[in-house]
Amino acid sequence: GHGSGVMPSSFRLARQLLSRIEDENTGEILPEWLHTEVTSEMKDTCSQIVKMKGKDLKDFPLLEGVRKQVEDPLDIFITMNLKPSLSVIGADGIPAIHSAGNVLRTNTDLKISIRTPPGLDASLIASKVQKLLEDNPPNGAHVTAEMTEVADGFLSPKLPDPVSDDLEKACREFYGNSSMSLYIGGTIPVMAMLQARYRDSKFIITGAGGPGGN
């Protein structure tokens, strides 16, 4: 504890490194290469979904007085499905509060999860994140970034016109509404794995909106 303020705190250094990826004030992901273009067509579709679902748009429980990072319903939907985000999901080197003493710790280990938008090469992104965290470390600290569980999100290719027309016809006939792309699950790698294995196949994933989606 006597060296506090002279010796760098490993937790402070970890915070500095995370700030290379995320704006700690807003939660916005900083590197441009972690973003992908949200096209006007995507925005229009998302806007239609938000208008259709209204109050049923997915919400999350919050303690009284706590505000979301994003408030506008359209921004919420786009952020959840088409934008990157960072979460700290685990930590080592930090003792439990009941056993913590007033001494500097030798290391802080964090496990982070970075959600990448559909359409990005996750392996390439992982190497860039590793370089971003390890290069020019603050105070000359020894920093190691190990990448695990790297997988692509799924950017659904355009359906053939006959399939799209049949889907539209069926939706109007049975539900009285036009068919829509929801983009939900686009950041989940399962469909990208299937598309990579069956490159000539087209997929229509339904039901993601929940039992009341229709």
Describe the function of each predicted region.
Residues 3-30, 111, 123-131, 207-214:
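His/Asp/Glu-rich mid-to-C-terminal helical/loop segments that flank catalytic regions of hydrolases
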Residues 29-107, 115-128, 136, 140-214:
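An extended, acidic, His-containing surface patch that forms the Zn2+-binding/catalytic region
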Residues 1-7, 98-101:
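A short glycine-threonine-serine/GTX helix/turn-capping micro-motif
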